[in-house]
A protein has these predicted regions:
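Secondary-structure boundary elements
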Residues: 1-54
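Extracytoplasmic/periplasmic, Sec-exported soluble proteins
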Residues: 4, 8, 51-62, 95, ...
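Active-site nucleophilic cysteine motif
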Residues: 12, 16, 55-70
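Charge-rich, solvent-exposed alpha-helical interaction surfaces
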Residues: 15, 133-136, 140, 166, ...
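Hydrophobic/aromatic-rich core segments of domains that either
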Residues: 61-141
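C-terminal helix-cap and adjacent tail motif
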Residues: 124-132, 141-151, 156-163
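Non-Sec secretion/translocation targeting segments of pathogen effectors
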Residues: 179-181
């Protein structure tokens, strides 16, 4: 399936399944597929064009791509990030990453999630409300991280060439802005 053939959220999931693997480009433009070794040291966010040409992305890029594809077919949606909070002084480059990005879309008076980056949950999930969706999705990642509390933050863009630390700071800064409202 090509991007031009996408007409529905199921088409987006099918496109992702056919064309995008879990992986990332590093600061040296080397591909890492299916592993997170040296992620904190070498990761950088990829552009949508890089994701499409290399056929790889972690949750950050995959969610951004699905977000753009949903907008392309005129379906309102939002991107969110759940993570164990790390302040900007966190410098353990060997620590595990505890972040997951997800996209929710809104049709027929319901809220839906397209999950592709988490290979254990690939699919489309339905929820009655945005609050229910965020809570249930976040609960999955709280359990996966051993019960640690995880803030959830809506985000609006994926800047190119951000390191993991840069992206985490971007999300933290969005939290600070929302607290000031």
């Amino acid at each position: 399936m090509s991007i031009d053939e996408i007409k529905t959220p199921q088409d987006i999931l099918d496109f992702m399944n056919e064309n995008i693997k879990y992986g990332w480009l590093d600061i040296n433009n080397e591909e890492h597929i299916g592993n997170m070794k040296d992620f904190r040291k070498l990761y950088r966010t990829s552009s949508v064009q890089e994701v499409l040409s290399h056929g790889i992305g972690v949750c950050i890029e995959q969610v951004y791509l699905m977000h753009l594809l949903l907008y392309k077919i005129n379906i309102p949606n939002k991107m969110f990030c759940t993570r164990i909070y790390e302040d900007e002084n966190f410098n353990d480059l060997d620590a595990d990453e505890h972040m997951h990005c997800f996209v929710l879309y809104y049709t027929d008076g319901m809220v839906h999630q397209i999950e592709h980056p988490n290979f254990e949950r690939i699919g489309i999930y339905d929820f009655a409300t945005e609050e229910e969706a965020i809570q249930k999705i976040n609960d999955i990642y709280i359990e996966m991280s051993g019960g640690y509390a995880r803030p959830v933050t809506e985000f609006f863009d994926v800047p190119n060439n951000y390191t993991f630390k840069d992206f985490n700071k971007y999300i933290n800064d969005l939290d600070k802005k929302s607290l000031k409202r």
